[in-house]
Amino acid sequence: MHQSGPAGLSGLCRVTDHLYLSNGRAANDPSQLTRGQITCIVNVTETKSSCPPPPGVEEYIHIPVSDSPVSPLRDHFDQVADKVQHTAERGGRTLVHCNAGVSRSAALCMAYLLKHRGVTLLEAHGWVKTCRPMVRPNNGFWEQLIGYEMELRGCNSVRMVPSSMGQIPDIYEEEAKNMMPL
C-alpha cells in the first residue's frame, strides 16, 4: 500500500513519495529540507517562520490555526490535500508541519490520504502513525476528520465514543480505559 520513513522526533517523516510530515524545528532546518528535496512547505502554526525558505522551496503556505479542539482545521482540508496532490503531479514534494508534528499537520496528512489515496480514516491514521508514531490529532480535529470522511465516503471507519476523559475516537478506547481521569 505505501512505504514510509520514520525519522524520529526531529526529522522529516515520509508519508508518501511526495508528502512529508514534521515538527517546526525540522521544517526550519535547511539541510533537512534540501536532503528531502522539499519544494512546498505548508506551515500550520500560528506564527510564520522568519527564516527564508532554502533554495528549492518554491511555495510556502501559512495556515495560522491553533492546536485547539475548536479551531476550524476542516476549512483547510481540501486546500491542503489538493496542494499536496498538485505538487506531486508536478514532481515536487510537500512538507506539512506544525509545532510538534503531532496534531494539526498529522490531521492534514490524514485528510490528504482520505481524499487522494482513497483510504478510510482508520487506514489513514494507521498509515501516518506508521511514519510518525507520536501522531495524535486533538479530539476536535478527529471530529472534523470523521465529518470529512462521511462527506467523501458516505460512511465512517472511526467514531467518537464516551470515556472518562470525554468523547474520544474509538481507536483510543482501550488506551483510555487504562488511564485515570485528572
Label every PLM stretch briefly:
Residues H2-G8, D78-R93, L108-L182:
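PTP/DSP superfamily signal
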Residues V102-L108:
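Glycine-rich nucleophile elbow surrounding the catalytic serine of serine-hydrolase chemistry
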Residues L9-L12, P30-L33, C51, V84-H86, ...:
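Beta-strand elements of modular eukaryotic interaction domains
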Residues A27-N28, E46-P54, E58-R90:
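Short polar/charged helix/loop
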Residues G11-S50:
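Glycine-rich, flexible N-terminal cofactor/catalytic loop recognition
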Residues M1-G11, E59-H62:
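Intrinsically disordered, low-complexity PEST-like regions enriched in Ser/Thr and acidic residues
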Residues L19, R93-L95:
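Residue-level preference for the first positions of well-ordered beta-strands
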